């Protein structure tokens, strides 16, 4: 950054690993649910141990965090409540699932939503006015905005 002081840095904060164990993981941490754990992970852990330290080391550099994990939790919750307008399973192939494996690697619906989050965060695109066809019936633009 010393050679390119005008750079802006965007750091994505992914969801917690092993989605099948989210509730137990949250309870083991003394919290009620995965959303509470993620909020702690973003604000108290990632910001304090990584992002705030980078900002101190490079005060003239703009450093943003993008907690993309929220969209993953929203999509998982929509799946649990049968609110997705697509035939998407919780675990399965990249094209047809939220997660591709037990660790929680993301399927296409999550990756596409994440791309929209980046589009909005980095370029300031207003997603409700954006007509990019995600290939999904579920309104991923709205999920990405929330």
Spell out what each predicted region is.
Residues 1-108:
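Alpha-helical cap/lid subdomain in secreted, periplasmic
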Residues 90-146:
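Histidine-centered active-site loop/cap adjacent to the catalytic His
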